[in-house]
Amino acid sequence: MNLKSIFENNDEKPLDNIPADGGYTAIFRTIACVGDSLSSGEFEADNGNGGSSYHDMFEYSWGQFMGRMCGSRVYNMSRGGMTAKEYCEGFADANGYWNPKYAAQCYIIALGVNDLLGQKQELGSPDDITAEDKKTFAHYYAEIIEKYKKIQPRSKFFLMAMPSEGEKDG
């Protein structure tokens, strides 16, 4: 990959040139995706009663596509409807995700839609990160990072921005 073609091109658009081999993502041999339905490859299906059912289809998640492209092992530590609070208060423990066997060189955390837009949880502030009594989104999000940093101190973290409520394409 020629970095000059990226950094010296003011008109460069990252999605116009996606390397078929995953590019520099391949430096990470293990990647963990912590998130909600946007991370779990969730499919919606007709339940036959006029409603919908939802199914996590990890094989179709963007994390697994990325893993196949770059040859990395990707752990899906996600579920449709997931919140940072639920992840910390039971989901991670129940699924063994704090277990060092899932230690990764890279963690991609994509939470917030269900927390802030769905459950209208208080966002919080940096002061909440270490406050035990202030259970805000910021507190739980930081707790996830802190626990994985203890499991794998040299890991890198990529925090995904979430879509805005009512955001339009274009």
Where are these regions (language model features)?
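Short, charged N-terminal helix-start/capping segments
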Residues: N2-E8, M77-G80, F158, S164-E167
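Structural recognition of the beta-strand scaffold that forms the well-ordered cores
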Residues: T30-G35, S39, R73-S78, Q105-A110, ...
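Extracytoplasmic, non-cytosolic globular domains
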Residues: T136, Y140-Y148
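Conserved SGNH/GDSL esterase-like catalytic core that processes O-acyl groups on lipids
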Residues: E44-K135, H139
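Glycine/Thr-rich phosphate-binding loops of Rossmann-like dinucleotide-binding domains
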Residues: G41, L117-G118, E167-K168
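N-terminal secretory targeting modules
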Residues: M1-F58, G67-R68, Y102, K150
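A generic local structural motif
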Residues: N17-A20, F91-G96, E143-I145
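Active-site segments of SGNH/GDSL-like serine hydrolases
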Residues: N114, I145-G170
